[in-house]
């Protein structure tokens, strides 16, 4: 299993090739390619490499699938017996990113091809 930990939007995200993740809003168009250069850790068949603070020569390639809004969070404040009530809502915007490959030490790790089902008759 190959994975990497990248920093984006002030958060650390564990990513694997072939999967999508919701990260903080990125100011790029849909279907645009992007590269995460702040790779903090890379785990591959040969072991794990931890960066100090980042892994030199490592990059994660991805593609933007869509932009969206998360579920609404409601904040309700009230003071009992005083008639003070405030209700606010917030929907955080996000970007859905498909991770295509993890590049490290001259190699590119992509999603493994799924084995085709063999039917026995």
Curated annotation (Swiss-Prot):
Cross-referenced PROSITE patterns: RIBOSOMAL_L21
Signal listed as a keyword: no
Single GO BP term: translation
GO MF terms, alphabetically ordered: rRNA binding; structural constituent of ribosome
Assigned keywords, A-Z: Ribonucleoprotein, Ribosomal protein, RNA-binding, rRNA-binding
InterPro entries per record: bL21-like, bL21-like_sf, Ribosomal_bL21, Ribosomal_bL21_CS
Cellular component GO terms held in the UniProt record: cytoplasm; ribonucleoprotein complex; ribosome
Xref: NCBIfam families: L21
Role played: This protein binds to 23S rRNA in the presence of protein L20.
Listed HAMAP family: Ribosomal_bL21 (MF_01363)
UniProt subunit comment: Part of the 50S ribosomal subunit. Contacts protein L20.
Family: Belongs to the bacterial ribosomal protein bL21 family.
Identification of the protein by name: Large ribosomal subunit protein bL21
Highest classification ranks of the organism: Bacteria, Bacillati, Cyanobacteriota, Cyanophyceae, Gloeobacterales
């Amino acid at each position: 299993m190959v994975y990497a930990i990248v920093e984006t939007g002030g958060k650390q995200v564990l990513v694997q090739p072939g999967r999508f993740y919701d990260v903080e809003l990125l100011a790029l168009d849909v279907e645009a390619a992007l590269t995460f250069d702040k790779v903090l850790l890379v785990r591959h068949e040969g072991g794990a490499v931890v960066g100090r603070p980042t892994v030199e020569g490592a990059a994660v390639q991805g593609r933007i699938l869509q932009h969206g809004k998360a579920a609404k969070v409601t904040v309700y404040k009230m003071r009992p017996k005083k008639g003070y009530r405030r209700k606010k809502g917030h929907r955080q915007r996000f970007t859905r990113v498909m991770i295509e490959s993890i590049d490290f030490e001259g190699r590119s790790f992509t999603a493994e091809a799924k084995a085709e089902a063999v039917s026995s008759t």
